[in-house]
Amino acid sequence: MSCATDTVATLMRAADLARRRMNAVVEPHGLTLQQYNVLRILRGAGADGVPTLEVANRMIEQTPGITRLLDRLEQKELIKRQRCIKDRRQHLCWITPKGLALLQKIDAPFAQTHEETLKGLRRKDRAAFTRLLGALHAAHA
């Protein structure tokens, strides 16, 4: 195998490991990782809300079904949506108090899972790893 093949295969195995560990945290709460990601985006937006298209653009994993994803979260009363007053073609999204409470339950176990997933890397190695992954992402964005 080439070095590039080995590198990509290792990256994919590491991503799968991280995804499985994070799924184990959110699934007992009735969430997918994509739904969790939406809730985090909306929590960060605060009271201003976020247009649907911006939520889609800020997702870690891009999804063509952002409307269905938001529908499910709205059915669970974790988010609310409202037509934008300035541009009636857009909908703004907010996290609800119920959504915030759910994230608060998940935050500590999620952070612990991140630490456990990265336990083989020292802090300076983590920083270098983050820079390398950022460069890889930027080259293809």
Descriptions of predicted regions:
Residues 1, 123-141:
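C-terminal regulatory/oligomerization modules of transcriptional regulators
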Residues 1-29, 76:
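N-terminal leader segment of winged-helix/HTH proteins
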Residues 5-9, 32-40, 67:
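Short alpha-helical elements of helix-turn-helix
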Residues 17, 41-45, 58, 132, ...:
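Short amphipathic alpha-helical elements of helix-turn-helix/winged-helix folds
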Residues 54-56:
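A short acidic, leucine-rich amphipathic alpha-helix
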Residues 71-131:
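Charged, amphipathic alpha-helical coiled-coil/dimerization segments
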